[in-house]
């Protein structure tokens, strides 16, 4: 019924549109352009296949992240990755690395897209394998290109492109010499607090822009967040995991206007995002109850981006250019996933290693006392020795030999004696043990390893009795923290030259752009792991023990040979060989105006990409030995039993061999758009464009060896390619328009992980072999996506002046897509060339209806959006892990249901320099989950899990219920 109601609304808008368009008198407009920006932008300025939002539109819609950017768009969504947040976009049936993300002309970090790597590591939360985001307050403009378009961005633009352009001082200093702005806001969905300061100024020939933004918030609170039991852990947890999220960004640009035609700009862009929390839903999380130690997974994930840029612009018109722009960028991106596993749930309650319920301590005089400042006493009950505080409550202490206890003089003033509960050793046939407080002198000594001072305990004269034991807390006094810190690094150096030239040949007008780029991108991985004695209590700081009868400050007095008070870090290692990717590109475009009714836009680009891996033994982070042992160079130990040194040497040789194999790719990309305006109110357009994605270095070089699953490199992969065809009809008048667009995008040479055969691995002694299953990345799939998109906006003032300021809008996206399936037994599979396998990245049918009003002088405005998404049908999903055995269902069991949302956003300007904005989202408090969120659920691993049988835990993937957002901005 809801879908039918939406259809009625659609017919209403189209009916209005027909009346308007029949009388229209418009200039040329381009195909399927969706512009959500200021109302002053005319329809004919929209570009082919774009969604364009400027800074004003972003503020009006209260956009704070990538999800908000596409909230009211159809045919483009955000990829979800659970704990790590979002990861790029999904357009035309493909996602992540197949949709280019660009900031100021620079590609952002790509995910490690090798399916083998994803299966081995991504499902366990070991890596922050996402695409970094961008700070909205820094943006001048965001442009989303639907469909293949390699002309703009080169590799990666298989299904589309999302590009961002940062602000410049000139954006604020058009008619004044200074600007200051401050924005503050709050979002209830994630408890986010926003503070942003913008300052711009001009002095003489110099200008400056500085934007600093801070966001402090928490996890996105799913529907019903407050009512779910927070003590439930692992895959059946319904409540979102708790995180504290901090985002800080600084954008600085200094410009120097040498003269009217020459300008230099130096830029600095630094963004740091941190998310700290507890991974309660992870399958490795210990239960709160039971006798086991409560080791908790503490996450500390980061996404950091820093770019330093230099830009030279020239506006001297000559035979070669009207404008010239030369740019150099140095960008560094680090995506970090850190995990610390230690107990701190409820301090002493759940962490017995640091429990001290009696409040035992040593006072300023060196006396060992309880929390009541009383002494500890002993009482023998049957065969057991028990110890009590001054109030008669049992105390956890244990006796240790005096000779085994040492004092850390770096933590305790060893000039003072100690009074400790002590006992004689007169049992076993002699007199009963005596338990009394004795005073010990401390004699300082120097550690042989230079690690500070220590002291031994020597009892003051006590007659013939020998006190050989002292009593100290029995608990370890520290929590063991096993930590892992894994970074994915992308370091880019890029040079661009871009030129424009307008000219006329006979009666034909040409607006040409041309140029090129050269970039070097270094991609690497660093894995660090180690141990630390975390949350050390006083007794673990003051006392220590011996190892092999020698003083060792790393040895707990109450531990064993497997425990330590000292932190250590393992050797740096990596699962990937570092690779430098060199890219060179040349491009040319020409917007040709043949006459007043016919326009032709043509473009060509050539890309050449070279992967150059580097591995230097002893310098490059080491690949784990077993990962590559004997893969290319046979392992032949000298003796029957191989030594570890021999294995390491062979592994290093294999890594060097793999790194010697360079790979190259080249691509020719084309784009052509034909526009015909047979009448003043009608435009007909046809577009053809191509895109490609060169294999990433990890898809080529990733190697992994294990008896149950081995992946071998493939140096002969081809680039993925796409062809996009569109036809559109646009009716328009003044600011009102209706565009109906039919499109088809064909993909081929999709990269996929394929089973090859059974193989063998070197194992144990020199002649032993172990069977394994061999996999490899290959090109094989082809795919096709077809669809219909409608985009319309009716300004009622174009129909009736009395309704000036009111507007209606409607958007629709309907897509269907299939890729070729595989047949045959493992190792002999082939494509059927039949497009019969669903593509999961395609969104269900989506409608967005908008009703709005804006005051003619922009003193206030209000917009209401109604979004309806259909349910994701079972037949339109594909279980990529389907094998007919362990995974018997070839479709995805858990899918998104249909939902309808209502959002209300308003703003008011009480005075010229102040703007107040507020929005209520999911006004009807609907419980729902988006398809992108639901499809992030994994069937195996440890993260993003639910109970696949009952569905328990799926509510954790729901979107927020009713929530609000407010902000205030002041400008001068």
Curated annotation (Swiss-Prot):
Coiled-coil intervals, chain numbering: none
Signal peptide feature range: 1-22
Tell me how this protein sits in the membrane: Multi-pass membrane protein
**Source organism per UniProt:** Haemophilus ducreyi (strain 35000HP / ATCC 700724)
Family note? Belongs to the TonB-dependent receptor family. Hemoglobin/haptoglobin binding protein subfamily.
Metal-binding in keyword set: no
Which residue range or ranges hold the TBDR plug domain?
A: 38-167
Please list the residue ranges annotated as the TBDR beta-barrel domain.
175-972
Where do we find the motif TonB box here? 32-39
Q: Null phenotype?
A: Mutant cannot utilize hemoglobin as the sole source of heme for growth. Mutation attenuates the virulence.
* Gene Ontology MF terms in the entry: siderophore uptake transmembrane transporter activity
Q: What does this protein do?
A: Acts as a receptor for hemoglobin or the hemoglobin/haptoglobin complex of the host and is required for heme uptake. May be involved in virulence.
GO CC terms, sorted: cell outer membrane
Q: Which InterPro entries match?
A: Plug_dom (IPR012910), Plug_dom_sf (IPR037066), TonB-dep_rcpt-like (IPR039426), TonB-dep_rcpt_b-brl (IPR000531), TonB_Hb/transfer/lactofer_rcpt (IPR010949), TonB_rcpt_b-brl_sf (IPR036942)
- Motif TonB C-terminal box in this chain: 955-972
Q: Sorted alphabetically, which keywords does the UniProt record give?
A: Cell outer membrane, Membrane, Receptor, Signal, TonB box, Transmembrane, Transmembrane beta strand, Transport, Virulence
Compartments, as annotated in UniProt = Cell outer membrane
The cross-references to SUPFAM superfamilies, in alphabetical order and at most eight, read:
Porins
Q: What protein name applies here?
A: Hemoglobin and hemoglobin-haptoglobin-binding protein
């Amino acid at each position: 019924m809801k879908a039918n109601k939406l259809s009625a609304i659609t017919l209403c808008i189209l009916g209005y549109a027909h009346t308007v368009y029949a009388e229209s008198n418009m200039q040329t407009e381009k195909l399927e352009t969706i512009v959500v920006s200021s109302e002053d932008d005319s329809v004919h300025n929209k570009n082919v296949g774009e969604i364009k939002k400027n800074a004003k539109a972003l503020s009006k819609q209260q956009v704070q992240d990538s999800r908000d950017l596409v909230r009211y768009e159809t045919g483009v969504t955000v990829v979800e990755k659970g704990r790590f947040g979002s990861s790029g976009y999904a357009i035309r049936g493909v996602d992540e690395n197949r949709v280019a993300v660009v900031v100021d002309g620079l590609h952002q970090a790509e995910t490690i897209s090798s399916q083998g790597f994803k299966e081995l590591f991504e499902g366990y939360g070991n890596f922050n394998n996402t695409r970094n985001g961008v700070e909205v307050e820094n943006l001048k403009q965001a442009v989303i290109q639907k469909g293949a378009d390699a002309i703009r961005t080169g590799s990666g633009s298989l299904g589309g492109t999302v590009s961002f352009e940062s602000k410049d001082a000139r954006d604020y200093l058009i008619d004044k010499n200074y600007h200051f702005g401050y924005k503050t806001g709050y979002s209830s969905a994630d408890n986010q607090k926003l503070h942003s300061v913008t300052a711009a100024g001009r002095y003489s020939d110099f200008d400056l822009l500085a934007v600093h933004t801070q966001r402090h918030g928490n996890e996105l609170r799913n529907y019903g967040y407050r009512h779910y039991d927070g003590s439930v852990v692992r895959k059946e947890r319904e409540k979102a995991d708790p995180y504290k999220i901090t985002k800080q960004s600084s954008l600085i640009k200094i410009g120097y206007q040498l003269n009217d035609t020459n300008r230099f700009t130096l830029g600095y862009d630094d963004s740091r995002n941190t998310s700290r929390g507890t991974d309660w839903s992870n399958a490795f999380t210990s239960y709160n109850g039971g006798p086991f130690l409560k080791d908790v997974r503490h996450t500390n994930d980061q996404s950091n981006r820093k770019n330093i840029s230099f830009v030279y612009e020239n506006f001297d018109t000559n035979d070669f250019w009207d404008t010239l722009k030369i740019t150099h960028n140095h960008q560094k991106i680090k995506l970090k996933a850190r995990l610390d596993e230690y107990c701190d749930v409820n301090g002493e309650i759940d962490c017995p290693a640091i429990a001290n319920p009696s409040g035992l301590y040593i006072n300023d005089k060196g006396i060992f006392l309880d929390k009541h400042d009383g002494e500890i006493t002993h009482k023998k009950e049957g065969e057991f020795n028990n110890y009590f505080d001054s109030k008669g409550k049992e105390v956890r202490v244990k006796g240790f030999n005096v000779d085994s206890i040492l004092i850390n003089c770096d933590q305790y003033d060893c000039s003072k004696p100690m009074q400790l509960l002590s006992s004689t050793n007169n049992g076993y046939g002699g007199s009963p043990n005596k338990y009394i407080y004795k005073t010990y002198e401390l004699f300082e000594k120097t550690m042989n390893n230079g690690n500070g001072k220590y002291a031994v305990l020597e009892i003051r004269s006590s007659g013939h009795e020998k006190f050989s034991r002292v009593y100290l807390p029995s608990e370890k006094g520290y929590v063991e923290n096993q930590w892992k810190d894994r970074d994915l690094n992308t370091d880019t150096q890029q040079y661009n030259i871009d030129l424009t030239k307008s000219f006329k040949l006979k009666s034909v007008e040409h607006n040409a752009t041309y140029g090129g780029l050269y970039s070097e991108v270094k991609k690497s991985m660093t894995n660090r792991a180690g141990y630390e004695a975390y949350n050390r209590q006083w007794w673990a700081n003051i006392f220590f023990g011996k190892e092999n009868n020698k003083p060792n400050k790393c040895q707990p007095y109450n531990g064993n040979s497997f425990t330590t008070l000292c932190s250590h870090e393992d050797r740096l290692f990596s699962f990937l060989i570092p690779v430098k990717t060199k890219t060179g590109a040349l491009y040319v475009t020409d917007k040709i105006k043949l006459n007043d009714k016919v326009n032709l836009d043509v473009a060509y680009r050539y890309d050449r990409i070279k992967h150059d891996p580097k591995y230097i033994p002893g310098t490059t982070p080491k690949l784990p030995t077993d990962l590559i042992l004997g893969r290319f160079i046979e392992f032949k130990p000298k003796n029957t039993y191989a030594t570890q040194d021999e294995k390491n040497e062979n592994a290093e040789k294999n890594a060097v061999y793999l790194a010697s194999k360079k790979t190259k790719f080249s691509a020719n990309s084309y784009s052509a758009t034909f526009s015909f305006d047979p009448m003043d109110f009608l435009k007909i357009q046809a577009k053809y464009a191509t895109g490609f994605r060169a294999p990433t270095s990890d898809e080529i070089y990733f190697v992994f060896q294990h008896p149950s699953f081995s992946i071998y490199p493939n140096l002969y992969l081809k680039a993925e390619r796409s062809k996009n065809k569109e036809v559109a009809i646009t009716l328009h008048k003044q600011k009102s328009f209706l565009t109906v667009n039919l499109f088809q995008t064909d993909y081929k040479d999709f990269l996929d992980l394929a089973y090859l055969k059974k193989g063998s691995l070197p194992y144990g002694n020199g002649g032993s072999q172990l069977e394994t299953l061999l996999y490899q990345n290959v090109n094989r799939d082809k795919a096709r996506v077809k669809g219909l998109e409608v985009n319309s906006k009716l300004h009622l003032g174009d129909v009736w002046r009395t309704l000036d300021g009111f507007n209606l809008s409607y958007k629709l996206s309907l897509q269907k897509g299939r890729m070729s399936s595989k047949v045959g037994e493992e190792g002999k599979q082939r494509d059927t060339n039949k497009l019969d396998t669903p593509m999961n990245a395609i969104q269900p049918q989506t409608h967005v209806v908008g009703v709005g009003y804006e005051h003619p002088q922009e003193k206030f405005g209000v917009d209401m959006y109604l979004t309806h998404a259909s349910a994701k049908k079972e037949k339109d999903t594909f279980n990529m892990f389907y094998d007919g055995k362990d995974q018997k269902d070839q479709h995805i069991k858990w899918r998104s249901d249909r939902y309808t949302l209502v959002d209300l956003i308003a703003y008011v300007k009480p005075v010229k320099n102040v703007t107040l904005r507020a929005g209520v989202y999911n006004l009807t408090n609907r419980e729902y989950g988006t398809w992108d969120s639901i499809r992030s659920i994994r069937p195996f691993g440890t993260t993003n899990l639910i109970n696949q049988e009952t569905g328990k835990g799926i509510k954790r993937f729901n979107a927020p219920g009713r929530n609000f957002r407010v902000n205030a901005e002041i400008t001068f």
